[in-house]
Amino acid sequence: MASDYYSSDDEGFGEKVGLIGEKDRFEAETIHVIEVSQHEADIQKAKQRSLATHEAEKLDLATHEAEQLDLAIQEFSRQEEEEERRRTRELENDAQIANVLQHEERERLINKKTALEDEEDELLARTLEESLKENNRRKMFEEQVNKDEQLALIVQESLNMEEYPIRLEEYKSISRRAPLDVDEQFAKAVKESLKNKGKGKQFEDEQVKKDEQLALIVQESLNMVESPPRLEENNNISTRAPVDEDEQLAKAVEESLKGKGQIKQSKDEVEGDGMLLELNPPPSLCGGCNFAVEHGGSVNILGVLWHPGCFCCRACHKPIAIHDIENHVSNSRGKFHKSCYERYCYVCKEKKMKTYNNHPFWEERYCPVHEADGTPKCCSCERLEPRESNYVMLADGRWLCLECMNSAVMDSDECQPLHFDMRDFFEGLNMKIEKEFPFLLVEKQALNKAEKEEKIDYQYEVVTRGICLSEEQIVDSVSQRPVRGPNNKLVGMATESQKVTRECEVTAILILYGLPRLLTGYILAHEMMHAYLRLNGHRNLNNILEEGICQVLGHLWLDSQTYATADATADASSSASSSSRTPPAASASKKGEWSDFDKKLVEFCKNQIETDDSPVYGLGFRTVNEMVTNSSLQETLKEILRQR
């Protein structure tokens, strides 16, 4: 039993051991499978990482190649642009060379043509003189008497003389002194003509034609063949008389023709055996330099005498030929050949401009680049500074040309006479301003500061050069004018601060310092009209009409400077009431002392007002000016007040 028992236990134990072994194998296999699976997963992950790394490397390589390609494209484009610029420069250089050659060829042809024409003029003058010398000795006295009478009739008709010529019958009965008397009358007539017409007046076409007829008649008389011996009653007259008369007549006609520029001045005068009558015109001033010119050492251009060296082109410095006079260009910078002027820049002296800007009033041409290259521009007349000239810089950065500088009003004390004259001007228009308030000149910064404190907000593109104040504020005014120092620098200017108080509706009028008297006066007239309106309680007017009436007053004041006469002040009040378009004379105009530039500047200021295209000042002036033209200043003012 015991053995059986033990036997059965052994079998059970063996089965257990077998089961345990089977379970261990299964677990071992499971673990093995898991390990294999994990290994395979690791391998897959490694492959994926390797593939990702490879893809990243490929992407980096592609990016690098793309960057290299972009760099190559940029380099190629840069080279293409440089090549294009090089080709453009070569084309421009070729074009410039071609233009230079073309210009030189044109100048050569012009010079050749001018030389030929000058030679023809000289040949014509010499031929005429030789003809006069050879033929004036071949005329008979009786036939010359007839011609003299015809000449006297034509000259008297030309000069509107009241005396009548000596008749043929009377002429024959006069002693040997008679022919000389007739010639003296003719010489006096020609001399009077030279005096009256040789001082800056252009001859009328009708007068030129008559003088040409006169020359033809003289030439006809000189070309006559020699006639039979003289009449018996004239045998006692010297054979020298007709010759002297012919030479006098020929010389008078030649001088007349020279005065019209039809023949050139010749150094060789017609020579005669006897004494010739002198027909020298009175001393005159050169139209260019204003110095005296001597008879025989000048050229007569449209009735004005010039030194030969003064009537030259400002661009090429060559004389302007007589046949080019009608086509030459003249402006404030000088005179020019028309061909030179079309290509000449007055700023940099460039003589071959391809494109140009042109000032609408001064008609001065300049290269467009000078508008933006820092070339100074006068704050008054708007002209650019030519090279080799020095504009003056004011303390606030504005530029002033030397012509405007000559009449500039520089400090507050200096402008007071103009202030008093302006009050007289307004009183003459029946618009007397009773209240007193200061008139101060200030720098640009002080004017801008006052404008802000006055709370003036201009919504238009305008340059403020004056302001009529209504509020109390502290103003820095120019108390001591600067003086011109070395190199046209302004030194010594002083300013002082003062408080303007409100004693009436106007506390002060401020205007930029350093402007010419004419421009300062126009601005003052404009601001004084604002003051007149405020002092009379006229506020909140239509802005366009208010600025328009102020511009009209400025324009009227400029008119008074242009047309003022010495006796106009006496009837200023009656003129204002009867005709508003005839302003009273301003006592400080001093028109007789004006320079040519001042006369041009007043026209420039008027032109600026008339051509202003701004929506308030320009439109306002044209609207109100038409109203004043159709009625009167006082009626226009009433209409403006009704339209507030």
From Swiss-Prot:
Residues 572-591 are annotated as: Disordered. InterPro entries: DA1-like, DA1-like_dom, UIM_dom, Znf_LIM. It holds the Pfam family DA1-like. CDD domains: LIM_DA1. Residues 119-138, 181-200, 244-263 form the UIM domain. Keywords: LIM domain, Metal-binding, Repeat, Zinc. GO terms for molecular function: metal ion binding; ubiquitin binding. Residues 284-355 form the LIM zinc-binding domain. Residues 572-589 have a biased composition (Low complexity). Disulfide bonds: none annotated. Interacts with ubiquitin. PANTHER family: PROTEIN DA1-RELATED 2, PROTEIN DA1-RELATED 4-RELATED. The UIM domains bind molecules modified by monoubiquitin or ubiquitin chains and promote coupled monoubiquitination. Ubiquitin receptor that probably regulates developmental process. This is Protein DA1-related 6. It comes from Arabidopsis thaliana (Mouse-ear cress). The lineage of its organism: Eukaryota, Viridiplantae, Streptophyta, Embryophyta, Tracheophyta. The gene is DAR6.
